[in-house]
């Protein structure tokens, strides 16, 4: 007997589906793209069952298409997420996530002594991997931080 499967989150006609987001990260991704302030319909699935991750988050954003730059920012939070662009209920494009080399004016430097807290300069981080851990190095104070420390702020 074939196992029946049913979508736990309704399909969208046009927009972006971000799947395989690690559990507990979906809300952060939503805020990263400022979707919590959007007038478009956003469907959020939190702690959904996943054979690969155990549990995962999922975002479906109607009538919004994520560009390559946004996808690279997403890679900081969910490097193995899948991003599908949907048109007329069909996947028309899959965006591959790649870590950006630099991230500018997105995160605040965790170092309270960094010049970015007192001067009108945009934050800037170099992004790299070390032993499969994502690290960010501040352009100004040159301190290196684990991704979680920078993205939690």
Curated annotation (Swiss-Prot):
Pfam families: PyrI, PyrI_C. The keyword Zinc applies. Zn(2+) binds at residues 109, 114, 138, 141. SUPFAM superfamilies: Aspartate carbamoyltransferase, Regulatory-chain, C-terminal domain, Aspartate carbamoyltransferase, Regulatory-chain, N-terminal domain. Keywords: Metal-binding, Pyrimidine biosynthesis, Zinc. InterPro entries: Asp_carbamoyltransf_reg_N, Asp_carbamoylTrfase_reg, Asp_carbamoyltrfase_reg_C, Asp_carbatrfase_reg_C_sf, Asp_carbatrfase_reg_N_sf. One of its GO terms (molecular function) is metal ion binding. Binds 1 zinc ion per subunit. GO terms for cellular component: aspartate carbamoyltransferase complex. Its cofactor is Zn(2+). GO terms for biological process: 'de novo' pyrimidine nucleobase biosynthetic process; pyrimidine nucleotide biosynthetic process. Contains catalytic and regulatory chains. Involved in allosteric regulation of aspartate carbamoyltransferase. Belongs to the PyrI family. This is Aspartate carbamoyltransferase regulatory chain. It comes from Vibrio campbellii (strain ATCC BAA-1116). The gene is pyrI.
